[in-house]
């Protein structure tokens, strides 16, 4: 990477979108790197940024579209691009677009499309 930024998660910034799309990291080695999630990102061609989120420490090889990781990714690209709203694409096998908006008091609004995977009722004795 050209640059690395460590917060709760690690962001590795690459020069080209294609580097992010084609990478095949060693999951065992990723467990030894700082950060809860290891993210790869680059400026995008058709979006503001592309990313991938690898989470072997959480027993997830790659998160298809990671909302929590994009809190830090959005803050980074907003600062770099001097834009309050960012359009991102997570380039996992499933992939997905995220629309990220920096709000007041360090909050970030994340929106995009989702897939319903379950519907359930939870009953609890109070």
Describe every region a protein language model picked out.
Residues 1-126:
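Active-site proximal loop and beta-alpha junction motif in alpha/beta enzyme cores
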């Amino acid at each position: 990477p050209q640059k690395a930024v460590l917060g709760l998660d690690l962001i590795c910034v690459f020069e080209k979108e294609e580097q992010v799309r084609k990478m095949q990291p060693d999951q065992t080695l990723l467990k030894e790197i700082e950060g809860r999630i290891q993210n790869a990102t680059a400026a995008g061609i058709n979006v503001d940024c592309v990313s991938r989120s690898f989470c072997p420490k959480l027993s997830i090889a790659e998160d298809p579209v990671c909302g929590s990781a994009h809190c830090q990714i959005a803050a980074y690209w907003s600062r770099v691009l001097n834009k309050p709203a960012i359009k991102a694409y997570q380039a996992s096998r499933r992939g997905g677009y995220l629309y990220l908006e920096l709000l007041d008091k360090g909050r970030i609004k994340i929106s995009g499309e989702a897939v319903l995977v379950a519907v359930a009722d939870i009953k609890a004795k109070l």
